[in-house]
Amino acid sequence: MEYHIIKKGIDSVLADNLLFKLKLFLADLAFEYPFFTEWLEKVFKELTLTDSRLIILSCDNGIFDIKGVSILKKTSDEKKICTLRVVKSSRNQGIGSCLLQKSVELLEENKPLITVSGIHMKEF
């Protein structure tokens, strides 16, 4: 499994392609969170402009074969895991744990905030 950190300075063509892939990968979240797609687009705009957004991708066969993702917000006021998702077929293989560990390291916070949909509270 490969892990890629996407941050400020990403090539705009690569960012557009990753946004497209993540919209597909996270499509079901649009049913759980109002305006999720618009939020994801905003994250990518912020990603190209500031250091406050980071994305960690877990990939199998190259950067576009996404198996898991963690979307982070890191500001002086907030260190937060906004989204953490592993594709169902790749769950229970340690990918989520690895994404969580890498998120904690990048956020430099042992107890970051994390957004969890009410539907998924029992999983945590």
Tell what function each PLM region has.
Residues 1-42:
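Short amphipathic alpha-helix that is part of the acyltransferase structural core
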Residues 43-59, 80:
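A short helix-loop-beta-strand connector motif used in the catalytic cores of GNAT acetyltransferases and
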Residues 57-58, 70-74, 86:
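GNAT/GCN5-related N-acetyltransferase fold signature
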Residues 62-69, 79:
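Glycine-rich phosphate/pyrophosphate-binding loop shared by adenosine-nucleotide-utilizing enzymes
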Residues 77-88:
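Conserved acetyl-CoA binding element of GNAT-fold acetyltransferases
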Residues 86, 92-106:
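Conserved acetyl-CoA-binding loop-helix of GNAT-fold acetyltransferases
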Residues 107-119:
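Conserved GNAT acetyl-CoA-binding A-motif
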Residues 123-124:
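Extended, composition-driven regions rather than compact fold-specific motifs
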